[in-house]
Amino acid sequence: MTSKRTAADAIAGTLKAYGAEFAFGIPGNDVLELVRACEEAGIRFVLSKSEPSAAFMADAVYQVTGKPSVLIPALGPGLANAISGIAGALQERSAGIVLGGEMATKQMGIYTHQGFD
C-alpha cells in the first residue's frame, strides 16, 4: 500500500522547517488531519480549554522562545473566539501562525453548523 502525502503533511513539514515546536487549539473535524500531520512532523499539539487561551499560549511560546508557534482553532466560532488572543499577539509583533478550519465546499449552504460566511 502506498501512502500519499496530503496538504496537511506539507503544511506541517513547512511549519517544522520554520522552527515550530508547538501547536495549540481545540480541534474540530475540519482540522483533525492537520493536527495529525503536525504531531507526525514532531510538532506537539496542546489541547486547550478555550480558543482565546490557545491563542495566548501560542503567543507566549514565541515571547519566551523566539520560535513561531501555531494556533489551530476549529471553524467559525472557534476562530472568532480566538480573535482576542490573535489581536494581542499582533500588538506584540509575535511570530505566530493561525490555521483555521473551514467546511468542505460541497457542504456550504447545506450543512451550516458553525459555518461563517
PLM ranges: what are they?
Residues 1-117:
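N-terminal alpha/beta PP-like core and its mobile active-site loop of ThDP/TPP-dependent enzymes
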